[in-house]
């Protein structure tokens, strides 16, 4: 009888040991996205649709992000973001300097291999816009896998619109030869280069 009781206890550990495994719920939207600049925030919003909530810290083109000082409320928004969309290249360092290693940051400079000291006005570059659209979409899919098809559909729609813009720019360049420009600031460099303009700004 003693042997039978002992054997019974030894063969039923599931009844005496608690199950500590818990299931992790699948993430649900919308994704909390914070962009440093409205230029990238508008792109993030278009690609995310109803599956994201996008806040842009700098909303006005009259504000120089170089000199911008975020308020406490701005820092709080950035710290709570699931995804931060930044420009980088020293243009908006305030947006990422206090973030942890786990913060998902999509940076135009990182995507394009630009560093501080390079022309930071990357939103004017067709290559930067295209690469950022893909990078942002990838970040969305990672954060909310259940909406993968919706994100991919929006990306394709954006790419179609961008292609139309690039086609127009290409036709413009073909019909206007030997175009030059001069500028006191490097803001429009990428845009003018994409349109085939040659920079004739005096050095020094």
Question: Across the structure, where does each feature detected by a protein language model lie?
Answer:
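Extracytoplasmic metal-acquisition and chelation regions
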Residues: 8-204
